[in-house]
Amino acid sequence: MKNIIKDTLILFAITLVAGLGLGLVYNVTANSRAMQEEKTKIEAYNTVMPGLGSFDNVSFDSVAADIYIKEQINKNETEKTIKSYNATIDEVIKAKDKSGNDLGYIITVTDNEAYGGSLQMTVGIKDDGTVMGISFLSLSETPGLGMKAKDDDFMSQFSNKKVDFFKYTKSEAKADNEINAISSATITSNAVTNGLNCAIYCVDFITGGGK
C-alpha cells in the first residue's frame, strides 16, 4: 500500500513538473511570437510610410465605414469584383513624422479571397489620398505564382498613385488606376487589389468622404 502511494506521488510530481515546463515553454514561445509579429508590423509601417516617426490608433465608426466602403464598391467596381469582395479593415493608425507633422494613414487590411485562403497587408495612404505603397504581413500563395505578389515588379505598381480605386488587367495596363495582374495568378491579383481598394475607401470615409 505504501509503495502504491509512493509511486502515485512520484507520478503526480513528474506530471506536475512536466506540465509546468510545458506551460513555461508555451509562454516563452508565445511572447517570442508576439514580439516577432510586432517587429514585422513596425517594419511594414516604415515601408509603406517613409519618414515615419510615431503613430496613434484611429477610432472610427466601423459599421458606418463598412456601409460606405460597400457603397463605393457598388459604384466603382465590376459585377464580378462586387460578388467576390471579402476584405475587412483590421486597424487604422495616423502616421506622423519625427517632428509630429501628419504624414497620412496606415491601414491594415485582410482579404479572404486569396488563392491560399487569406492575405493581410498594410497600406500607406497620405492625407491627400496618394497611396505610398503596400507591405504584406501574411501571404500564403503558390510559390512561383501568387507569391510573386511580393515582387517589386508587382508591388511597385501601387506606389505613389493617387486614384479613386485600382483594378487589375490581364493585358497591358494603360490607365493610372490599372495594374498588370500576375501571370496565372489573377485570384491573388484580385485579392490584393480589393484589399487595397478597401483601404482607400476607408481613408476616404475617415477624412470626410462618408459625411
Language model features by range: what are they?
Residues 2-211:
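Flexible, solvent-exposed loop/hinge segments and secondary-structure transition points
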